[in-house]
C-alpha cells in the first residue's frame, strides 16, 4: 500500500496546477492533503470524486484557513473529523480513517508563529492528539500519523538550526513533544531509511532563493506505531 502526504497550501490553486494529474501518476492508494483552505460549499464534485478515490474532508469555520482531506481507494471502515474536543475540532485539522489493520490520522498541526497564545494552543493540541491516538492504539490496532507537524524535530531536520533555536517550529518545547511521540513508540518512517541531513519539505518563500539553496525545514512526517514497523518498505520525500 502506498500513502502520500502533501501540504497543498490551497487545494483550488493546486488543482489548477495539476493535482489530479499528479495523483493519477503517483498511483497512491491513499493521499492525505493539508491546508486545503476551502469551505464545504466550495468543494466541487470533481474534487470530491477524484477518479478511483473516495474523499473525506474537514474544514475550518474561518474562511481560507486550515483544512484537510483524505483521498482513499480502499473504503475505510469508519471516518471521523470530530473528537469531542474544542482544541482538536475547532479548525478543521484532522481526518481519521480506520482500515482493517490500522488507523490513519491526516493532520495539519497548528503553527505557533503568532505569539504565546498560539504556542499554548499548539502544545495543547499536541497533547490531546497523542492521548487520542494512544486510546485507539490501546484497543489493539496500529496507528499511522501523517501530515504537516509544523515542527522540525532535530538539528538534522533544518538547514540552519543554530539560527532558529528560538524560532516557531524549532523551539525546545515543540521539539520535546515530537520526542515524546517517538518515546511512545511512533517511528519517523523517513529516518528508518535516511540518516543524513539536507532533506527538507518546506522552504520559506520570504527567503530569496531558499529552495534553490536548499535552506529548508523538514516539518512534514509519517509516523507509524511500533506494531506497523514491519509493514514499512520505503519512505521518501517527493521533489
Predicted regions and their residues:
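Soluble or luminal CAZymes and related metallo-dependent hydrolases
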Residues: 11-15, 89, 121-128, 170-173
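Active-site-proximal beta-strand elements of phosphoester/diester hydrolases
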Residues: 1-9, 101-113, 146
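N-terminal, active-site-proximal structural segment of metallo-dependent hydrolase catalytic domains
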Residues: 1-50, 54, 60-66
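A long, amphipathic alpha-helix that forms part
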Residues: 119-140
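Structured beta-strand-rich core segments of catalytic domains in phosphoester-bond hydrolases
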Residues: 37, 45-112
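Active-site beta-strand/loop signature of hydrolases that rely on acidic residues for catalysis
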Residues: 7, 23-41, 104, 133-155, ...
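Metal-dependent phosphoester-hydrolase catalytic domains
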Residues: 25, 40, 79-83, 155-239
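Surface-exposed cleft-lining segments at the edges of enzyme active sites
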Residues: 84-85, 110-126, 162-166
Amino acid at each position: 500500500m502506498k500513502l502520500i502526504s502533501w501540504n497543498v497550501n490551497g487545494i483550488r490553486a493546486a488543482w489548477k496546477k495539476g493535482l489530479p494529474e499528479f495523483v493519477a501518476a503517483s498511483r497512491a492508494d491513499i493521499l492525505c492533503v493539508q491546508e486545503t483552505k476551502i469551505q464545504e460549499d466550495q468543494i466541487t464534485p470533481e474534487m470530491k470524486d477524484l477518479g478511483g478515490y473516495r474523499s473525506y474532508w474537514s474544514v475550518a469555520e474561518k474562511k481560507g484557513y486550515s483544512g484537510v482531506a483524505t483521498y482513499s481507494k480502499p473504503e475505510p471502515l469508519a471516518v471521523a473529523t470530530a473528537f469531542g474536543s474544542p482544541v482538536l475540532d475547532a479548525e478543521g485539522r484532522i481526518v481519521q480513517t480506520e482500515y482493517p489493520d490500522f488507523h490513519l490520522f491526516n493532520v495539519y498541526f497548528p503553527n505557533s508563529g503568532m505569539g504565546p497564545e498560539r504556542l499554548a494552543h499548539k502544545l495543547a493540541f499536541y497533547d490531546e492528539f497523542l492521548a487520542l491516538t494512544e486510546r485507539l492504539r490501546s484497543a489493539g490496532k496500529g496507528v499511522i500519523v501523517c501530515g504537516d507537524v509544523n515542527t522540525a524535530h532535530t538539528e538534522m531536520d533544518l538547514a540552519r538550526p543554530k539560527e532558529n533555536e528560538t524560532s516557531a517550529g524549532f523551539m525546545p518545547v515543540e521539539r520535546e513533544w515530537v520526542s515524546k511521540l517517538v518515546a511512545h513508540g511512533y517511528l519517523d518512517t523517513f529516518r528508518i531509511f535516511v540518516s543524513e541531513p539536507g532533506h527538507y519539505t518546506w522552504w520559506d518563500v520570504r527567503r530569496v532563493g531558499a529552495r534553490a539553496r536548499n535552506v529548508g525545514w523538514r516539518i512534514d512526517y509519517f509516523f507509524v506505531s511500533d506494531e506497523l514497523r514491519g509493514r514499512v518498505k520505503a519512505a521518501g520525500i517527493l521533489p
